[in-house]
A protein has these predicted regions:
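Accessory nucleic-acid engagement/destabilization modules that flank
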Residues: 1-239
Length: 239
């Protein structure tokens, strides 16, 4: 399945965009955007893993059998009423890998939450609600969804080797170090209370989220309108 896994089907002529192409290209764009804050590796990982759940057989069978669908709508509903969640697999993979770092201090866990929330939110109108009305952590329900619903194990088995290898390379110490450099001024400021620190961490998360959203939409739009892609590239060139 890995070689021919599909990400999108072009409305104009039915041309298929391979999932590996969408993931690698979105990763590059997201990395370029996040590099503005020296977080290029973070942006790359977000772009690479945002649609990891599309490697599931359920999703591939669905996109190949149905026309006129929106392949970027999360929680597709099959004719039998079954939903297909294609974003949480990437959430769980990133959270699992990053939380290994600085476990005693909870640093990797924090970064895993930040990136996971970005991926979980990438087809909504903004970041998902992280707390419920009583202040309880709502995000953990998404992160802890069963494998039966997220298909993480299946996606790891089906995914292109190039995607998995790059993901493992990105989710390492250099990425953690870049995030540490970004949050250190926030967390080390003794004059700032915790609520303000959490606000600034939220701002950083929103920046990363915007990098992923822009990259995903740019790549999807370029695939739908190839002529537009060339115009955009020309516009990016300096005079």
């Amino acid at each position: 399945m890995a070689k021919d896994a599909i990400a999108h089907v072009r409305k104009l002529d039915g041309l298929q965009q391979l999932l590996i192409d969408h993931l690698l290209e979105t990763s590059t764009i997201s990395g370029q955007l996040a590099a503005k804050l020296n977080l290029g590796l973070v942006g790359e990982l977000l772009g690479l893993m945002h649609d990891f759940g599309k490697y599931s057989q359920d999703f591939q069978e669905y996109i190949k059998s149905v026309t006129g669908i929106n392949p970027d709508a999360d929680d597709y509903v099959l004719p039998n009423g079954k939903k297909i969640d294609h974003s949480t697999a990437g959430v769980q993979w990133v959270y699992r890998e990053l939380r290994k770092f600085g476990a005693a201090q909870g640093i990797g866990d924090l970064f895993g939450q930040m990136l996971g929330i970005c991926i979980a939110s990438h087809h909504g109108e903004g970041l998902i609600d992280c707390l419920d009305g009583e202040g309880n952590p709502k995000w953990i329900e998404r992160f802890n969804k069963t494998d039966e619903l997220t298909h993480l194990a299946e996606c790891e088995q089906n995914a292109n080797e190039a995607v998995q290898q790059k993901a493992k390379e990105l989710a390492g110490e250099n990425l953690i170090r870049s995030l540490l450099n970004a949050v250190k001024p926030i967390l080390s400021d003794q004059a700032t209370n915790n609520k303000i620190k959490e606000f600034y961490l939220g701002c950083l998360t929103r920046f990363l989220f915007s990098c992923l959203i822009d990259a995903d939409r740019i790549n999807s739009s370029d695939f739908e309108r190839e002529a537009q892609k060339e115009v955009r590239r020309l516009a990016e060139k300096p005079d």
